[in-house]
Regions:
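Positively charged n-region of N-terminal signal peptides that target proteins for export
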Residues: 1-10
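Alpha-helical tetratricopeptide repeat
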Residues: 137-145
Length: 214
């Protein structure tokens, strides 16, 4: 009888310990999400990092949510390579495509916007790397961004990198761009050609550009 009582107490203790850990994990994740939502990205990141040992003992469902939040934070902080890694880990841990896909779309838009800025300031080397990231996120859909990455690599005079990208384009049998987009720079009055519909849609929203056309 005593053994049965001891066993029941052990089971109860283990259950309480599990519930306590689970509550603690969810509480820290909620708090980190609050920091993120309020735009306090560094605080959200610090809280996740300081709670690493707590999250390490969690199940994959919690871990996938933690990595998703890491990805969202790094996207907002423009740490794009870290964001990609975090989202990949979240996917591998079982996060649903319904939850992940919108975040990947936001990441793609953020990277493209940053690359557009790099090209405008003639930082072609960084633009090439970022556009390659967009391709890597979804190689089946984003093949055109590998083409843009190669073009930026040429502009940066990194011909070895450009050749690497062009050879990859050949390997995937990229057939080129069919639709051309045009928009006028307000400052110069010059019309420029835009090959990306996403970039075109972003520039249309800018006061620095006018007269968009296809």
């Amino acid at each position: 009888m005593n053994k049965l009582l001891i066993m029941k107490k052990l089971i109860l203790y283990t259950l309480l310990l599990f519930v306590s850990f689970s509550y603690g994990q969810k509480k820290e994740l909620r708090n980190a999400n609050k920091f993120y939502t309020s735009g306090e990205y560094s605080s959200a990141l610090d809280l996740l990092d300081s709670s690493k040992s707590l999250f390490d003992s969690s199940d994959d469902k919690i871990k996938s949510q933690v990595m998703l939040l890491y990805g969202k934070i790094h996207t907002s902080m423009e740490d794009f390579s870290l964001a990609i890694k975090a989202f990949d880990m979240s996917r591998n841990m079982g996060i649903s495509n319904q939850i992940l896909s919108p975040e990947l779309s936001k990441l793609e838009t953020a990277i493209i916007t940053s690359a557009v800025g790099d090209n405008e300031t003639e930082n072609f080397s960084e633009a090439a790397k970022k556009l390659k990231m967009v391709y890597d996120i979804n190689p089946e859909i984003n093949q055109e961004y590998l083409y843009y990455a190669a073009s930026s690599a040429v502009n940066s005079m990194d011909y070895n990198l450009a050749l690497e990208y062009y050879l990859l384009l050949s390997d995937i049998k990229y057939e080129g761009i069919e639709t051309k987009f045009y928009i006028t720079e307000v400052a110069s009055g010059s019309e420029i050609e835009i090959n990306s519909e996403t970039e075109f849609n972003l520039l249309k929203k800018s006061k620095d550009y006018s007269n968009p056309r296809e």
